């Protein structure tokens, strides 16, 4: 007789954090994670995102990806029902509400007496504005009217799904797992003649890489020999290269093109001193958690959502509007008072530890077992 429930998670794109999280969950569940898309097909990721899927994760094939129209960026997995019947999970967890194959998997689960979870971030439009309970969400609520649990990724998302979308007491809070064990071993930063800055996020409009370059140009003008390391992926790559030439930063900016594997990524953070993230919008971000674990100084936009519980302005980081002068002012607080690196790092490593694979798996299991009455 099995002691562990069989858990299936259906997710969009395979990422190393989720693959490692699936491994961590084996202590509590017979877990498998199935993905609609591989990073090699997803052009927004670097090649180093490709990793060993191990024994518990796989890419579903064949999958139809809708590139435009009403179902833009949605997936249909042709073999899904067959695969579900073979694995026969006790719990079906879905990464999001609106993917067509997720809806099919959900109805299969309900028809066959399975427990159901939807794991979700906040729902927003393309401008980062939170959605209300309009026609689409009324329809989705009808589809998922009998869901057992809606697991959101941050405290500030609860109200939207509990009240606006009317899922009520089904809503609980958990979090994304972060692959931070190697980062926690990095040495503390201290006083240097010049510092290395990191823009770790993709070069996409909402993350404002052009703004990061303008901020760094001001830093470099005041502190020669400063360096900026930049994520090499994203649709704004050419515009960023043009901006680098315009600002004459060619000798001071390094694109991160030589990361050979996921397990090498932490070395980029070890080389860096201060994370700069002047985003116009973000739902919360792994890069901030990684920088916290690494012991870096952190200067981020006040438009980053979902992280108020762990990053607090002037306590363990600095937050400001995504404007050049404001970012420069906050960066200089680290430069002029290097003791802040140690103070913030010591606080951040305590705050970020619960996001590790092991701790997140433990928390997820406790919430799920209690909410779904798996011990009864």
Predicted region positions:
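A short, histidine- and acid-enriched strand-loop-helix "catalytic/donor-clamping" loop
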Residues: 100, 114-133, 146-149
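Carbohydrate-associated surface elements
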Residues: 156, 177
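Conserved donor-binding/catalytic core segment of Leloir-type glycosyltransferases
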Residues: 189-220, 229
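Nucleotide-activated donor-binding/catalytic signature segment of Leloir-type glycosyltransferases, i.e.
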Residues: 241-259
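Short alpha-helical donor nucleotide-sugar binding micro-motif in glycosyltransferases
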Residues: 267-272, 291
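Aromatic "clamp/platform" in nucleotide-sugar-dependent glycosyltransferases that forms part
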Residues: 280-281
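Short hydrophobic beta-strand element within catalytic cores of glycosyltransferases
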Residues: 297-301
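Conserved acidic donor-binding segment of nucleotide-sugar-dependent glycosyltransferases
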Residues: 313-325, 333-338
């Amino acid at each position: 007789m099995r002691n562990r429930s069989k858990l299936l998670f259906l997710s969009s794109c395979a990422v190393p954090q989720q693959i490692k999280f699936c491994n961590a969950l084996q202590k509590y569940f017979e877990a498998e994670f199935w993905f609609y898309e591989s990073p090699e097909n997803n052009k927004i990721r670097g090649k180093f995102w490709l990793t060993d899927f191990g024994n518990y994760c796989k890419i579903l094939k064949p999958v139809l990806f809708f590139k435009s129209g009403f179902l833009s960026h949605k997936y249909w997995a042709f073999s899904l029902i067959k695969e579900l019947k073979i694995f026969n999970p006790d719990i079906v967890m879905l990464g999001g509400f609106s993917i067509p194959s997720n809806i099919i998997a959900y109805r299969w689960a309900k028809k066959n007496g399975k427990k159901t979870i939807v794991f979700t971030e906040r729902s927003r439009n393309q401008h980062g504005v939170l959605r209300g309970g309009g026609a689409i969400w009324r329809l989705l609520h009808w589809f998922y009217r009998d869901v057992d649990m809606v697991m959101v990724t941050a405290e500030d998302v609860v109200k939207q799904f509990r009240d606006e979308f009317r899922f009520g007491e089904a809503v609980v809070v958990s979090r994304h797992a972060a692959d931070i064990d190697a980062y926690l071993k990095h040495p503390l930063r201290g006083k240097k003649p010049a510092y290395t800055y990191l823009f770790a996020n993709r070069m996409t409009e909402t993350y404002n890489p052009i703004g990061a370059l303008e901020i760094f140009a001001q830093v470099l003008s005041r502190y020669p020999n400063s360096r900026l390391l930049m994520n090499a992926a994203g649709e704004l790559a050419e515009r960023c290269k043009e901006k680098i030439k315009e600002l004459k930063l060619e000798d001071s900016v390094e694109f991160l093109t030589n990361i050979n594997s996921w397990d090498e990524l932490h070395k980029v953070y070890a080389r860096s001193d201060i994370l700069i993230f002047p985003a116009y919008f973000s739902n919360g971000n792994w890069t901030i958690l990684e920088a916290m674990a690494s012991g870096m100084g952190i200067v981020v936009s006040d438009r980053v959502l979902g992280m108020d519980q762990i990053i607090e302005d002037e306590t363990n980081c600095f937050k400001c509007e995504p404007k050049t002068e404001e970012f420069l002012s906050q960066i200089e607080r680290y430069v002029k008072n290097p003791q802040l690196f140690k103070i913030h790092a010591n606080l951040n490593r305590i705050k970020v530890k619960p996001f590790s694979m092991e701790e997140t798996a433990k928390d997820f299991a406790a919430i799920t077992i209690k909410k779904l009455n798996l011990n009864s």
